């Protein structure tokens, strides 16, 4: 598949129920559970599925699959803000108990994150 095609259609093969060719935007915060036990299993990560949009939803899943395909990666992660992206990057690159060296001229909240939260 050409890069341009991946950018437009990657991560979504069309909806067999509606025939939609483009991925829909799911404007919901919560998802239905089959039962209380099913909801508990979702939140305990015992089964796959959607539980709350801030964690994951079908719209962001398509975006993540599309970005991974464009970049030739195994996966991708979308987050709600640049600060969240900074946090994830620091947590995944820095070793526990180590040091993070940064300039005090960073965005103030990033500096606070580095000095107070990620220690």
Language model features with spans:
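Structural motif
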Residues: 24-25, 75-78, 98-99
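Fold-independent oxyanion-binding glycine-rich loops
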Residues: 11, 29-30, 81-82, 90, ...
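N-terminal glycine-rich, Lys/His-bearing helix-loop that initiates the first secondary-structure elements
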Residues: 1-47
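Conserved PLP-anchoring active-site segment centered on the Schiff-base-forming lysine
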Residues: 92-110
């Amino acid at each position: 598949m050409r890069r341009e095609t991946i950018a437009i259609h990657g991560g979504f093969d069309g909806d067999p129920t509606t025939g939609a060719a483009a991925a829909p935007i799911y404007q919901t915060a919560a998802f239905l559970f089959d039962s209380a036990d099913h909801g508990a299993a979702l939140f305990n990560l015992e089964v796959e599925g959607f539980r709350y949009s801030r964690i994951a939803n079908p719209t962001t899943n398509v975006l993540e699959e599309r970005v991974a395909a464009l970049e030739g990666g195994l996966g991708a992660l979308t987050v709600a803000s640049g600060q969240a992206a900074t946090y994830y990057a620091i947590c995944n690159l820095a070793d526990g108990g180590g040091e993070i060296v940064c300039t005090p001229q960073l965005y103030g909240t990033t500096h606070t994150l580095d000095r107070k939260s990620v220690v």
